[in-house]
């Protein structure tokens, strides 16, 4: 049969992920956009935007880009190399059951996982309520007054507790005591944090080794890592008598049965909520918590959700006490924390809502009963259980049989914990089944059935909990799944995430989080691996981590990658510690000065302070560039003591600075190292490499450039890349290489989300990643071109171009019309948009970053909204609109405004359906403008009483 002459094969590639799925504008749309910007080709725009002196010469290449199906097959092949045995290792990581209604409707739901940190409260009411539930849960379980909305992991939370204790203690001591029964990774991270700050760390038995007068605080583990359940009340009283602070690392599941840290008198409680429905995932991500007494709440690190009111007086939630945080206080902040673990905290809070106090208590009781049954069988075999009282963990002396028993357990499909050279630890959880107990007994040489023993309890009677918890009605809702599903849906409908609209936040890179990238994170081969499982059970993880590290080295020009930092801020901290340890190894103990431009992100100076460095600010020029003359002067002035400089590239002003190589050369000439903040790496991938420019170390925000979703404020990943000379000083880990310097609880931070970044790289290929960078730059320049004339673009390069983001100056509107940047941001909500980054790095401005994933239609819709807002401001200037009663000042408008009594001098239609807003699928804010001052002056950080919910519904 002959082929008809009119039939032609198409070259269209339906599964070309990079160009058909990830990159928003079509080729035809790009041509239109380039004309608007003033260029004939994308390469012409890049040549005019990126200095030739920094552009990489060789293209970024690593094999053929895969389709979604091919990448998923590759991920499946890799995942199958992992062995998801039943891990009873414990040590802060436990098996748990994620209720399917939570997995499907939160963890796998883009309405939850693509949202940003809730800085704009009006469009974040759903997750703010879920986080308030989390805080209420933690306060109830710990018996303390105020809890934050999550921290990165238990070990870093412990380090934060130590730092907080030093801030608030009246004791003048410079040492911190750590219970030797704390988890080893917790002790290691505390030691890392303390060393550059000059604090001593004393590790020992608190009942024999603690001298309260010689420390500013102490941390106790409850229950201990080896299972001990102890009453710390006398020790806490002794610490208070010495004006020191008491912190307790507590397992929230155990607190359902045990006396709370607050009832013992503790000032601070920290821990992990992982076993509340969040898989172990080879170490993370998980939501840690911190709760404190009311008197010291203003020194607490991390996000804090509080209750306020909106302009109508209705209840509304917001982030409270933000003046404590790094983006405002910089090196004087309580911490460098930026990203937390919001998505995981939401899951944990919903786990509590799903089960209620009765269900949670039943789970805790069952875990304890199974542990008692296990202990009875082992005792019958002649083994002595080390802690007489325990919750879920027991430790046994087995002598020379340790290796034999551990191997026998693995043969039974069970991992046990190796403790020293002669002991074994066993920790049970809600996934432990009768068959698991029988398998463990067989590994120890027994042949029992669960029915051979009668359960009882082995908790100390004096520590049994009698106080109530989770009394708020939200934890007593109807358990029907239909109700749970609808509650989750109601909350998500109050929020604005990427599933509804572009989120053009500058310096945040809110790009597509493709479904194909997300799918593998819930596969048990990735989600059910314990971080301290034998290495031969995680070969798939190691293959993925190694390959992703190689790709990141190719992208950055560095020689080695550490995956341990589990946020961008942690990456900064780890990178600076790497530099510090490099200088110390050379004997240059005096090199402690860090030069940082005044325009830097607040985490930079906060991280430098944590690393024991003296921050010396460097001026910025009027065009936003680093003042090279001032930089040279400061480098010469501090030459002897210069440790490093921290710069962001492209700059925080959204421009490729021409002098970046000179900055690196000056720093090196004075013996310093260069830390190049990778926050803006989305403008460099495939075009320029930090390691080629002269940088020595960078962190990469995988939750920005490499597609891990922001999760409403976490999780994130901040791996660091370094040049070869810094490789020996990368973070170590007590459970892997035994080296010091750990910055996170798990060796690879939050590895269960690494499949997202890896699959992104596989599906894009080097060519696709390069194209994504170019289109990100095009999209930003297109917005800048369209808005020029209505607004001033504050900073551009010598060629008049911006990088991947642009800063729009709204300050003239305040002078001419009384319209603030806040008014513009809230009016964008009426148009169905999350506002760009407000007042950073310049007060009164908006920083816009569209990313490569947004289509021309969405960019045009945003520009239409911004231009319409400018026209509304012009109407105020011309006297056609009232200066105080107008759509900008009253934004955002709600359904209650629309259907209620209308007495405003503009129409309902103008209020609620401005240009850019969808008429059919319009997003409605659930509250009017939130009163920030009221929220901080009347701080409430737990769920309001049910009467307020009833009143709001009337």
Curated annotation (Swiss-Prot):
CDD domains: GDC-P
Keywords carried by this UniProt record: Oxidoreductase, Pyridoxal phosphate
Top enzyme category: oxidoreductase
GO CC annotation terms, alphabetical: cytosol; glycine cleavage complex
EC number: 1.4.4.2
Coiled coil: none
PTM annotation (N6-(pyridoxal phosphate)lysine): residues: 704
Catalytic activity, reaction form: N(6)-[(R)-lipoyl]-L-lysyl-[glycine-cleavage complex H protein] + glycine + H(+) = N(6)-[(R)-S(8)-aminomethyldihydrolipoyl]-L-lysyl-[glycine-cleavage complex H protein] + CO2
InterPro entries xrefs: GcvP, GDC-P_C, GDC-P_N, GDC_P, PyrdxlP-dep_Trfase, PyrdxlP-dep_Trfase_major, PyrdxlP-dep_Trfase_small
Pfam families: GcvP2_C, GDC-P
Family that this chain belongs to: Belongs to the GcvP family.
Protein known as: Glycine dehydrogenase (decarboxylating)
GO MF annotation list: glycine binding; glycine dehydrogenase (decarboxylating) activity; pyridoxal phosphate binding
Gene: gcvP
Residues spanning the membrane: none
Subunit structure: The glycine cleavage system is composed of four proteins: P, T, L and H.
């Amino acid at each position: 049969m002959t082929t008809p002459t009119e039939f032609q094969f198409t070259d269209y590639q339906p599964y070309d992920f990079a160009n058909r799925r990830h990159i928003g504008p079509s080729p035809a749309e790009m041509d239109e956009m380039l004309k608007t910007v003033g260029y004939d080709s994308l390469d012409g725009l890049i040549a005019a935007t990126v200095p030739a002196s920094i552009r990489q010469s060789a293209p970024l290449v690593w094999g053929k880009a895969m389709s979604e199906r091919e990448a998923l097959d590759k991920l499946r092949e890799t995942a199958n190399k992992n062995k998801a045995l039943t891990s009873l290792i414990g040590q802060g990581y436990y098996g748990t059951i994620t209720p399917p209604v939570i997995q499907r409707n939160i963890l796998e739901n883009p309405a939850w996982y693509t949202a940003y940190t809730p800085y704009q409260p009006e469009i974040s009411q759903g997750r703010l309520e879920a986080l308030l539930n989390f805080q209420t849960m933690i306060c109830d379980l710990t018996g303390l007054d105020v809890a934050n909305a999550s921290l990165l992991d238990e070990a870093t939370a412990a380090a934060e507790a130590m730092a907080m204790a030093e801030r608030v203690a009246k004791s003048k001591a410079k040492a911190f005591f750590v219970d030797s029964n704390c988890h080893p990774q917790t002790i290691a991270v505390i030691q890392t944090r303390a060393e550059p700050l000059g604090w001593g760390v004393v590790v020992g038995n608190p009942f024999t080794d603690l001298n309260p007068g010689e420390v500013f605080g102490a941390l106790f583990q409850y229950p201990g890592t080896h299972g001990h359940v102890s009453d710390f009340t006398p020790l806490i009283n002794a610490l208070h008598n010495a004006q020191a602070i008491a912190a307790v690392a507590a397992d929230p599941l155990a607190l359902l049965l045990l006396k709370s840290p607050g009832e013992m008198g503790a000032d601070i409680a920290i821990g992990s909520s992982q076993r509340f429905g969040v898989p172990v995932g080879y170490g993370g991500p998980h939501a840690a918590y911190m709760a404190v007494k009311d008197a010291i709440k203003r020194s607490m690190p991390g996000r804090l959700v509080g209750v306020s009111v909106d302009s109508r007086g209705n209840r509304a939630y917001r982030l409270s006490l933000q003046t404590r945080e790094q983006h405002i206080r910089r090196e004087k902040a309580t911490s460098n924390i930026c990203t937390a673990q919001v998505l995981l905290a939401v899951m944990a809070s919903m786990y509590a809502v799903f089960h209620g106090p009765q269900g949670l208590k039943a789970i805790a009781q069952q875990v304890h009963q199974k542990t008692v049954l296990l202990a009875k069988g082992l005792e019958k075999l002649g083994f002595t259980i080390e802690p007489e009282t325990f919750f879920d963990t027991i430790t046994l002396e087995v002598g020379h049989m340790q290796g034999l028993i551990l191997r026998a357990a693995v043969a039974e499909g069970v991992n046990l914990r190796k403790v020293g050279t002669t002991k074994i630890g066993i920790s049970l959880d809600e996934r432990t089944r009768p068959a698991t107990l029988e398998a463990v007994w067989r590994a120890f040489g027994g042949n029992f059935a669960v029915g051979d023993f009668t359960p009882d309890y082995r908790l100390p009677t004096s520590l049994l909990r009698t106080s109530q918890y989770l009394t708020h009605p939200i934890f007593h809702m109807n358990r029907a799944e239909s109700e749970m599903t609808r509650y989750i849906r109601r909350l998500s409908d109050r929020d604005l995430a990427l599933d509804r609209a572009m989120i053009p936040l500058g310096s945040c890179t809110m790009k597509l989080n493709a479904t194909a990238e997300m799918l593998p994170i819930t596969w048990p081969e990735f989600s059910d691996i314990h971080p301290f499982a034998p290495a031969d059970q995680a070969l798939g993880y190691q293959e993925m981590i190694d390959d992703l590290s190689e790709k990141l080295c190719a992208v950055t020009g560095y020689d080695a990658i550490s995956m341990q930092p589990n946020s961008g801020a942690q990456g900064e901290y780890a990178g600076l510690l790497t530099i510090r340890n490099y200088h110390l190894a050379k004997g240059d103990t005096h090199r402690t000065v860090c030069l940082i431009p005044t325009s830097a992100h607040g985490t930079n100076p906060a991280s430098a302070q944590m690393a024991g460095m003296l921050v010396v600010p460097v001026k910025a020029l009027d065009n936003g560039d680093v003042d090279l003359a001032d930089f040279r002067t400061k480098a010469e002035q501090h030459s002897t003591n210069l440790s490093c400089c921290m710069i962001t590239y492209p700059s925080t002003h959204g421009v490729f600075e021409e002098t970046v190589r000179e900055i690196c050369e000056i720093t090196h000439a004075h013996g310093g190292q260069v830390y190049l903040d990778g926050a803006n790496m989305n403008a460099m991938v495939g075009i320029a490499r930090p390691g080629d420019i002269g940088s020595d170390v960078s962190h990469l925000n995988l939750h920005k450039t490499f597609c891990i979703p922001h999760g409403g404020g976490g999780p994130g990943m901040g791996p660091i890349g370094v040049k070869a000379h810094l490789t020996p000083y990368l973070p170590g880990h007590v459970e892997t290489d035994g080296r010091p310097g750990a910055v996170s609880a798990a060796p690879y931070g939050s590895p269960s989300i690494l499949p997202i970044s890896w699959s992104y790289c596989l599906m894009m290929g080097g060519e696709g990643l390069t194209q994504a960078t170019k289109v990100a730059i095009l999209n930003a320049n297109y917005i800048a071109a369209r808005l020029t004339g209505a607004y001033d673009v504050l900073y551009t390069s010598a060629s008049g171009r911006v990088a991947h983001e642009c800063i729009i100056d709204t300050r003239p509107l305040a002078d001419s019309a009384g319209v603030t940047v806040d008014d513009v941001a809230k009016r964008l909500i009426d148009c169905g948009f999350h506002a760009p980054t407000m007042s950073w790095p310049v007060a009164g401005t908006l920083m816009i970053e569209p990313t490569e994933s947004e289509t021309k239609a969405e960019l045009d819709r945003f520009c239409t909204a911004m231009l319409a807002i400018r026209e509304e401001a012009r109407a105020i200037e011309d006297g056609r609109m009232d200066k105080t009663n107008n759509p900008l000042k009253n934004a955002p408008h709600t359904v209650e405004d629309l259907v209620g009594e209308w007495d405003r001098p503009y129409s309902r239609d103008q209020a609620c359906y401005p240009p850019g807003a969808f008429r059919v699928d319009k997003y409605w804010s659930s509250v009017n403008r939130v009163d920030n001052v009221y929220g901080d002056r009347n701080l409430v950080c737990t769920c309001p009483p049910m009467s307020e919910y009833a009143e709001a519904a009337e």
